[in-house]
Swiss-Prot record:
Name of the protein described by the UniProt record: Small ribosomal subunit protein uS8
Taxon lineage: Bacteria, Pseudomonadati, Pseudomonadota, Gammaproteobacteria, Vibrionales
UniProt gene name: rpsH
Originating species: Aliivibrio fischeri (strain ATCC 700601 / ES114)
Biological process annotations from GO: translation
Subunit-level organization: Part of the 30S ribosomal subunit. Contacts proteins S5 and S12.
Sorted UniProt keywords: Ribonucleoprotein, Ribosomal protein, RNA-binding, rRNA-binding
Biological role: One of the primary rRNA binding proteins, it binds directly to 16S rRNA central domain where it helps coordinate assembly of the platform of the 30S subunit.
The keyword Hydrolase appears for this protein: no
Annotated InterPro entries: Ribosomal_uS8, Ribosomal_uS8_CS, Ribosomal_uS8_sf
Family: Belongs to the universal ribosomal protein uS8 family.
One term of GO molecular function: rRNA binding
Length: 130
């Protein structure tokens, strides 16, 4: 059976891994998943990530905890294959009053909602992380 939405699968694996207090989660790798992981690491939501293997690369995300609680309280897919969500730079959402981020796919690559607003770019809203 083929996977219909690999990004939703990635976010679900991270959510389930943190709910089960796992140290790391593994999943099939893609360029978009690696870009999302890099953004989450830069924003401080995950500890680290690595791509392993040549023929079938796997993405391993090391999860981050603070005082035995997951750093990611909420991770939610917004734009999906059946319903794409696009916003202009002045209409980009602020997640939890600025405490969270919205991952936005712009013409300049993947970035947080704050960075996209600062650059004056809109795009597809991939997910919310808080």
């Amino acid at each position: 059976m083929s996977m219909q939405d690999p990004i939703s699968d990635m976010l679900t694996r991270v959510r389930n891994g943190q709910a089960a207090n796992k140290v790391a989660v593994k999943m099939p790798s893609s360029k978009l998943k690696v870009a999302i992981a890099a953004l989450l690491k830069a924003e401080g939501y995950i500890a680290d990530f690595a791509v392993e293997g040549d023929i079938k690369p796997e993405l391993e995300i090391t999860l981050k905890y603070f005082q035995a609680k997951p750093v990611i309280e909420q991770i939610q897919r917004v734009s999906r294959p059946g319903l794409r969500v696009y916003k202009k730079n002045d209409a980009l959402p602020s997640v939890m009053g600025g405490l969270g981020i919205a991952v936005v796919s712009t013409s300049k690559g993947l970035m947080s909602d704050r960075a996209a607003r600062k650059a004056g770019l809109g795009g597809e809203i991939i997910c919310y992380v808080a």
